[in-house]
A protein has these predicted regions:
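NAD(P)+-binding Rossmann beta1-loop-alpha1 motif at the extreme N-terminus of oxidoreductases
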Residues: 1-63
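Residues at the starts of beta-strands that form the adenosine-phosphate
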Residues: 7, 32, 117, 144, ...
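Short beta->alpha hinge that forms the Motif I/post-I loop of the SAM-binding pocket
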Residues: 38, 72, 97-99
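Rossmann-fold NAD(P)-binding glycine/threonine-rich loop
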Residues: 97-137
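A short helix->loop->beta-strand "cap" motif at the edges of active sites that frequently abuts
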Residues: 30-31, 88-92, 114-116
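Rossmann-like NAD(P)-binding element
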Residues: 58-95
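Internal alpha-helical scaffold of NAD(P)-dependent oxidoreductase catalytic cores
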Residues: 139-174
């Protein structure tokens, strides 16, 4: 599969984030994978598992990413968006994997500029396990990923997220 993005940043490396990293690596979604987590222990585990090319506890590690996927608890997503926003390159698409959308959109969009569209997403997949060791590349295989981009220019950017859905698991429906 051809890489969809040059640099993919995943913020939060629990089950979903680590599965995205594994899928991106397995299916060639990105030329470079960046893993960001506030927990240094998680970052050390990510390095040991070889889930990313770059692994950091710093929000600034999103710099240069074409796509940033927020894989953090819904209650923390606004704070995380505020931390990464100053480091986003113009044109970088920001997405999430939260199970609710209205609260996430309300928490994230005030921190992003028009140059960084937000495309909310909800991959309908998961297990009862958590942490970077629990992820697996096929978590999203034959699963839905619901995209909820707002009306307007951002909707045109959702093709990048649809492509990422294919990259996480080529057999999934974008």
């Amino acid at each position: 599969m051809t890489a969809v993005v040059e640099r993919l940043a995943i913020v939060g490396l629990g089950l979903i984030g680590s599965s995205i990293a594994r899928g991106a690596r397995t299916y060639g979604l990105a030329r470079e994978i960046v893993a960001i987590d506030r927990d240094a222990g998680v970052i050390e585990r990510v390095k040991a598992l070889g889930l990313a090319d770059v692994a950091s506890t710093e929000a600034s590690a999103v710099a240069g990413a074409d796509l940033v996927i927020l894989c953090v608890p819904v209650g923390a997503i606004g704070d995380v968006a505020a931390q990464i926003a100053p480091h986003l390159k113009p044109g970088a698409v920001v997405s999430d994997v939260g199970s609710v959308k209205a609260a996430v959109v309300a928490a994230v969009t005030p921190h992003l500029s028009e140059k960084n569209p937000f495309v909310p997403a909800h991959p309908v997949a998961g297990t009862e396990y958590s942490g970077p060791d629990s992820g697996f590349a096929t978590l999203f295989s034959n699963r839905w990923c619901i995209l909820t981009p707002p009306e307007g220019p951002t909707r045109r950017r959702s093709s990048g997220c649809r492509a990422c859905g294919r990259g996480w698991a080529p057999s999934s429906r974008p």
